[in-house]
Amino acid sequence: HQGKGFHHYSTLVIDVNINIVRLIRLVRVLPGGRVIWKGGNGLGTDITQEFFYIEDGGVFEYSEGTISGGEYGFHNDGILYIYGGNISGTNYGGYTYSFGTTTIFGGTVSGGYYNGGKTIISGGTFIGGGSGIGDYVYWNGKGGTTTITGGTFGTSGNGTIYNGGTLYLGGDGYAYDYIYNGASGRIYIIGKLNIIIRIHINITDIVLDTPIILGGSDYVLTAEDIKKIQIILPDGYTWRYDASRGGIIITSTTGIKDVTVDADNKVLYFDASGRKIEKLQKGLNIVKTSDGKTKKVMIK
């Protein structure tokens, strides 16, 4: 078959093998359309875009079979359910846009997965290797929302998740190496932690003393949960749990490590945590002058 494949408005059921030489995409689900991929394999020699694309208002249900050979396994701007099977792409295995909702119960997505909309994961396996997101197997982009209660991220249970949006973690049915949390990322724990989670925090442009990891969905982090959270930070930073705000915050241990005072600003003030302040306040203050000297000042 050569061309643009199927543009579908109503209900289409696929349960046969499809071999493709050159195609832009196999299936495009238009608003109001529904495709049920019950089984069969879709093998492409040269798919220039994706195997299937779901527009806003379209529905795709993928149950079994293997699809491969495209730059993308799928693009989703509608509603997608993945129950099983294998989906792969050379750039991304899958990509969910801002209007899309993808729910994954099982199966395997190979080549990396990008979420810019809403993705709910209770099972399945995610494998990297695509050119789109480098060493990561899952990328939750800025503005994206991901809920993970199950699934394996990486070929042997170890893989890296990037979070630049909102990430909800619950249950103990998921496995990965660590989460890399970007400056705009927020992580919400929505249930008791039964496994250790490892999180790298990117402190570039991050707002210090602002909760980064919190309880969510009416769940409050407990002391036992905190023991199961390992946070990896660059030198000069530390973290602590702020019970009054129900979350983990990042603070500077040096405060003035990389701060330069110019000639027009003779003195800079910092509180004990290293946060810049406009003037001296009660308690311990750190003062840095333009000649490079620092001193501690206690105000009673």
What are these model-derived regions, one by one?
Residues L12-D15, I20, P31, V35-K38, ...:
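All-beta strand scaffolds that present successive hydrophobic residues in beta-strands
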Residues I286-K300:
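C-terminal tail/sorting-segment detector
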Residues G151, G170-Y174, N181-T253:
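Extracellular/surface-exposed low-complexity segments
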Residues Q281-N285:
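A glycine-anchored, Pro-Gly-centered beta-turn/N-cap motif
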Residues T251-S273:
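Residue-level detector of functionally pivotal "anchor" positions at catalytic/ligand-binding pockets or at interdomain
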Residues V29, I54, Y241-A243, F270, ...:
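Hydrophobic alpha-helical segments, especially N-terminal targeting/anchoring helices
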Residues K4-H8, V21, R25-L30, L43-T45, ...:
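Glycine-rich beta-solenoid repeat tracts in large extracellular/virion proteins
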